């Protein structure tokens, strides 16, 4: 399936950006920590800063589609690694998307503040 990339240009940007590698690592890290991460305007951790840099290199149009691609990749990783089932897995996955949703705002991406991902992703795909 075309997945998040209905816009071919964005798929290309996603590949050029090495699938937003830093963002994937950041999403994974955040999702595996239960509890909310640091609040407020603390120093950005270096990994988050790298992720923001990746997003700033995208065209605004592609920020959400590429983030969605990154989220999906992380979701797959978690599924394979964890062997977690049901409830716990769903929580991790929803944290991935929650984190991704707000990244444009966290990173001050012009013209994009929140990516409209569904909060609850449908069951195993």
Curated annotation (Swiss-Prot):
This is Napin-3. SMART domains: AAI. Keywords: Allergen, Disulfide bond, Seed storage protein, Storage protein. SUPFAM superfamilies: Bifunctional inhibitor/lipid-transfer protein/seed storage 2S albumin. GO terms for molecular function: nutrient reservoir activity. The small, basic, water-soluble napins are one of the two major kinds of storage proteins synthesized in the seed during its maturation. Belongs to the 2S seed storage albumins family. The keyword S-adenosyl-L-methionine does not apply. It comes from Brassica napus (Rape). The keyword Coiled coil does not apply. Disulfide bonds join 10-62, 23-51, 52-107, 64-115. It comes from the Eukaryota. The mature protein consists of a small and a large chain linked by disulfide bonds.
